[in-house]
Amino acid sequence: MDTLVEKASADLKSTFTISNEMSEKIFVIPPNRTRYLSEIAENNRVYDKKGLEQFEVAQKLYGIYKTICSVMNVSSNEVEKSLIGKLGLNEDEILQQAQNDKGIAIPKEGGTTDEESQRSLLHLLIKEFDRVKLNLDPYNWEIITTWDEKVKKYKNPIYSFKVRDKDINIETHSESLSHLQIPKIALPKYQAWGDLLKWCLQENVPGEFPYTSGLYPFKRTGEDPARMFAGEGGPERTNKRFHYVSAGLPAKRLSTAFDSVTLYGNDPDLRPDIYGKIGNAGVSICCLDDAKKLYSGFDLAHVMTSVSMTINGPAPMLLGFFMNAAIDQQCEIYIKENNLEAEVEAKIAEIYKGKERPKYNGDLPESNNGLGLMLLGVTGDQVLPADVYAEIKTNTIAQVRGTVQADILKEDQAQNTCIFSTEFALRLMGDVQEYFIDNNVRNFYSVSISGYHIAEAGANPITQLALTLSNGFTYVEYYLSRGMDINKFGPNLSFFFSNGIDPEYAVIGRVARKIWAKAMKHKYGANARAQMLKYHIQTSGRSLHAQEIDFNDIRTTLQALYAIYDNCNSLHTNAYDEAITTPTEESVRRAMAIQLIINKELGLNKNENPIQGSFIIEELTDLVEEAVLLEFDRITERGGVLGAMETMYQRSKIQEESLYYETLKHNGDFPIIGVNTFLSSQGSPTVLPAEVIRATEEEKKFQIKTLKNLHNANDTQSLLKELQHKAVNNENIFEALMEVCKVCSLGQITNALFEVGGQYRRNM
């Protein structure tokens, strides 16, 4: 370079300086951490190898122990149990028992018996036991010695345990119509210590590491795992559907589908490429008032209410709308409890002097009490004292339960609703999680790491699980690189899987829990809460067919059975007509009935670990787990998840597997009833829907009008500039979004962030 400057007589020295807001290279995952997936695979294999070694040691110890019992001619279980203690064999007890038992005799070489030879043999056996026990982990010895206590706890009528310092008492049995006591948890009847230890290390009871059979000792009573997906038209129509699907259920578990306009961060508009999509295949939400109307009539801070939002690119903005809607609901409750309605109404009238106030479009559904609609067009901080509002806000965000999907990695790999550059999207995710930690948001999941879309795009169950878990561990590494505490962000992570009918789907949840728990505990040193992988299951939409659509309910039932037997944390059962149209109220009711019948009527489901102990389930678990770990190694070879994405490895793999399935389906090698075999006399033609449900013109125009009134009512430019300033200066963007979302529309916020974060461009 110096020679070039000299010969050209030109000043080529750069005067560019890097400021605090810039970086030469953005590393989402530090370069020295790109092998994290192979490290996890090795960690889990080491755990399994050590478990097998400990199994061998425990079996030897059991053999020596039973030999001692045989030499002493012990026949009583109580006496046998008295021979072992917390530290090992009770040597004094053994010798005392030998001294007291006159019938015990050990032959000598000459055919005579002698007490000395007996004591000598016992000493040798005790010595050998102690020598072998040196190779047994003390934790594993505790598992062996406390097994009988564990069995007793499950045989007692009531099992007591704690969840977040709250005492829970659960009945351990249910009575059948034949008056048999059916155990909720069935335990193995192993006697040998090695068998017991191996089972505890690899399976264990629900609620204990490695959580293979479930995260909690027992399922919750009074709250079924049902979470039904809904979204169509404007917020009012979807609000009516929410009240319909949750009618009569003690727990209100709402799952929200958004239209493509919202998914891409746009506002409703007359533009031809937007207008036709408003409110179709999802609900149209563009501002805080829309969120208030969408969830009106549901107390969002109630312990029995939970909301899931399937949104990714603009997830932080929709989360801001939701949080502010929940806060304003609690402000409304405060206003009513303190008889402040007239005072608040006067303040709102003053704010909207000469302007049209927002309103709920149409009549409220019967079960909607109007909660959340009092403060349409304003927020609680405009009508309540600052200290009162601050306290309500703090309490509310700590109480709300739910999930926002916000999984940007799977969007690049399978779904395609990316709007910001990958690095900026990940930064937004990190800012949300940081805000959750700083503000004690413990009951809301900041991300739902999703395999469903990967499976729907064509991936087989092993690829779905491997890519989903690899994405999850990528978020763990990224959050750790930002200095977050794994024990604080770990519990805010959740997962979302599809359930088909393939054999691997029978174990997808248990394998996910095992891999996650072992890695989080032994690789990352996380606590028990962070080790628990919580996941939602939706039955496979791809498995539903447009021919013989009545058969789809049979497929969905079998998939739901897989999910419930595998102890999923929540479940959505698809409607049989989803293959041809947006589900009707009738088809949604049938879909809901599928899981209710399994949960309420199916006798075997009274037991909560029905697949444990099955040879094929154990074999499948081992096969799928190793296949996932091998995929981790393949991703590592390509530079980790982000490196593999640069060469479109994940997308290519999904497409190849999709093509393989479609080929087998079309040539008939993969039989599908009513599609390529067992055809009706008419040849099982495609069923056409009686009507295709779409958003009405009135709904579309009302959404555009709502947006126009919002823009006319608020001065937003200063807030948007402040948001951009925080983004450029590496401050927490979501903290600013919580304020911006009160007055700005989704499209305004998206466009403002495009200017500082960059738009998404796919690698070519």
Question: Which residues fall in each region the model found?
Answer:
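Flexible glycine/proline-rich, aromatic-decorated loop/lid segments
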Residues: 442, 483-489, 526-539, 547-579, ...
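Generic recognition of stable, solvent-exposed alpha-helical segments in well-folded globular domains
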Residues: 3, 120, 124, 249, ...
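Extended helical scaffolds that flank P-loop GTPase cores
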Residues: 3-94, 98-108, 112-193
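N-terminal glycine-/lysine-enriched basic segments
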Residues: 575-581, 601-623, 635, 708-711, ...
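Short beta-alpha connecting loops at secondary-structure transitions
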Residues: 413-418, 454-460, 496-504, 538-549, ...
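Short acidic (Asp/Glu) and glycine-rich catalytic loops that position anionic groups and cofactors
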Residues: 1, 271-274, 300-303, 411, ...
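Intrinsic disorder at enzyme termini
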Residues: 569, 601, 605, 627-719, ...
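Catalytic alpha/beta active-site cores
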Residues: 148, 152-499, 504-505, 523, ...
